[in-house]
Amino acid sequence: PVFLADVKGDLAGTTLKGEENENVKNRISKLKIEDFEYKSFPVRFWDIFGIGGHPIRTTIDEVGPDILSMMLGLSEAQEGMLNIACKIAKDNNWKLDDTKDLRLLIQYVGDNKNDFITQYGNITTQTIGVIQRCRLALENQGADKCFGQPELDINDLIQTNEKGIINILHAVELFKSPDLYASFLLWLLTNLYSKMPEVGDLEKPKIVFFFDEAHLLFNGMPNYRLKQITQVVKLIND
């Protein structure tokens, strides 16, 4: 199985059998491949907006405050405030499915900050306001559509139909919001790492990821978060 992020909308051709041309012929000759055969492959399209493929949904709880902070474009101090809010929700067994739940949580924490400061740390009205504005901006990008139920099961990406299924993320619209695009790909990686069992060395990889414009994962990223991502990527590669 393969997962491809398609930011230009030009990878759908993998559903069709290829056609011969000079470039392909030269490549086959260079690689010394004998009895080469053009084939089509089973493809499944995904789109967090649900327009160019099956919708991909997750929950605020599943994404977690670290990646959610990336999506919101928060500073380190603001991320700390979001961590406090999420810890309060966890301690009270409050489920956070979508951005509406997030809005209500942040509002509640702000309105009752004096009840939480002693146990959880400083909570400022200014930071609460910044997080709410960033959440609203995220919703205006349409990102609220990727939060809610039912959430994606990572095993849905690891399916075969005689051949490994090619999962294509239709990311033409998503790529217009680079921070959201990068955060979403990072969530997929961390989800894969946390959900997949340790199996040791395999004859074939369980799934292959191709991230178009992957440098966006690291652009402008603070060092503390860059270390986290590097660790996840190394562990998955191992």
Question: What residue ranges belong to the model's regions?
Answer:
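P-loop NTPase motor domains
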Residues: 2-5, 9-237
